Amino acid sequence: MEFAQQRDAVIVEDFFDQIYHDLTPFWGLQPAKIRRQAKNFDFVISIRNGSTTVKSDDTDRPWMALWNNLTATVAEWLPDIDIPINVMDESRVVVPWEDINEYVKVERATRKLVAQPEVVTEYSGLRELDEDPGEPFDPEWIKDGLYWDIARVGCSPDSPSRDIEALTNFSGPPPMPSGFPARSFKGYVANWTEAKDPCLQPDLRGSHGTFVEPISLSTTHYLFPLFGGSKLPLNNEILLPPAMYWTTDEFYSGGEEHGGAWETKNTGVIWRGVASGGRNKLENWTRFQRHRFVSMVNGTAVQLAEKNSNGVGPNFELLSYNTYHLTATQYMDLGTWLNGISEAAFVNLVCFPETGNEHCPYTDSYFEVKKVMRMRKQYAYKFLPDIDGNSFSGRYRGFLRSTSLPIKATIYSEWHDSRLIPWLHFVPMDNSFVDIYGILDYFVGTGIAEQQGGEEKPSVQGAHDEQAKKIADAGKEWAEQVLRREDMQIYVMRLLLEYARVCDEKRERLGFIDDLR
């Protein structure tokens, strides 16, 4: 607590719920087993006597270096521990729901309030483990198959996705809502937790690259401690603040220039990125989320779909104008409107197999490749959509800290989720993206300023610019209080103290009671 007070931290107990969600199942494993699993993993950050060391391969692993740097800043206050690290983009641990349920039952049965005289306040240490690390363990990595079928065992038996098999044909547009997205309120995200959960949305198996064809596949159904920067809600990794949030590299952080005043910004959408999300190929690229989003906010692509294909594009399908009742489409067609307010493009089409350049023979005719735009230049626009890549998007924290408004769609969980409130700190978006038009219509309106009778200055029909600014300002102000580097340090310190407790033979009696003495 002293560490947090010295850094002027906002401490709300709910901010740390993710720690206990992640660690609870490990009470179902013997501490000695957890310690040996952690010690013998291939990629490990170890703390001994307040200093950190890294075990890795010879490959350059920038994430390992960044996480080690973060851990080292708080290591002097931590006990000896081994922290296994997931160096891949993709989540790697998904334990069957039934197994996790049994592990949680053990935690509930064994954790009790302990009388003060019985509390142990010192960790046991790892001297015996260092002297005898034991044999390497085999997580039994699954490296073949369809990830949807591998992952859905992590869904509860009564969830919509549990018994739905993976798709094998990914030609044509993905499954799209025929009306308002499920679990929405009048077409807009009402429950952010549900909106991100693949267990509740079987259609994601055919519309998100994670389930179509991830970049790499190395997953286990075996519970062991593995730390990473993001995970699906059904995965069992232990979340750290992502390494890209700790870096000062302006490519991800946007630097300390967070954009100018709202009134000086371009009233429109900007998005730049690579065509990541998995291995997009000739036979499946139409099912990838970034390709779909770029197409759906491209005025020309939308005009072609409207005029030539009854609203159906190669990788999306438009809803009827009568669904969201947009103000803009009362004055012009959807494509024309988008041409005036949206600017989204890839900087690399990332072919599989690779072409050796930024182009791709099977998507070149659909997408224009543009130059990289640094985040500081993107901050000149009011609206910043953020879309999953191979996993989470590393730009989200930078967007939240900017004076622009983040519009977020994701299926990934991060360390800070309980700190951020949708519609207060950011605008949530459904992973089908069918609500993007309604979102922009509400905030931007027609995009055309006209002088109305009795008004001092031109106004935009249907626009709610002040409401957009209010959310952007609230998100920035809150991020500057709870998403600082200091807040990441505090989270990691508490996480690793609790993790060390789970690894300790005396864990049921281990506790902090100095405040009671």
Model-derived regions, located:
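Secretory-pathway glycan-assembly enzymes, especially type II membrane glycosyltransferases
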Residues: M1-R374, R509-L516
